[in-house]
Amino acid sequence: MKKTIPIHKECHMNTRCSHFQTCPITTFHKIISGKWKILILWYLTNKPLRFSELKRKLPDVTQKMLTNQLRSLEEDGLVLRKVYPVVPPKVEYSLSDIGKEIIPLLESMYNYGVMYTENINKNKDKLKLAD
């Protein structure tokens, strides 16, 4: 049986819901919105990473943007920042306990991406055969 997701009766695509500020979807959107946040969270699912390691995995992100996105994820409680008292300075980023709760969602997004890509490629092949 398909699970029904509760929606406030005031929620419609063309009107603003009176529960907008407390809506779980609004909250979730707020914490993961950002061009690089989902990828940062994805890369942190396996192990803590240093800033430079994240930067290498995300070559198109600027240093300033990566710093801002990490800071935002830290402020929202999804990412922990650990500073080691060594010279040169060493800082590692990892998922917090609440951040680890997002791993199943990221895995679902990954699986959806695989399925979507396979379907798009199949449809492209069918279109090529029709030409």
Located regions from the model:
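C-terminal regulatory/oligomerization modules of transcriptional regulators
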Residues: 1-22, 75, 80, 97-131
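Amphipathic, positively biased hydrophobic alpha-helical segments used for protein targeting
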Residues: 33, 44-45, 88, 103, ...
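Beta-hairpin "wing" of winged helix-turn-helix
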Residues: 74-94
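Residues within the DNA-recognition helix of helix-turn-helix
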Residues: 69
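The DNA-recognition helices of helix-turn-helix-type DNA-binding domains
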Residues: 47, 61, 73, 113-116
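N-terminal helix-turn-helix DNA-binding core of bacterial DNA-binding proteins
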Residues: 19-65, 85, 92
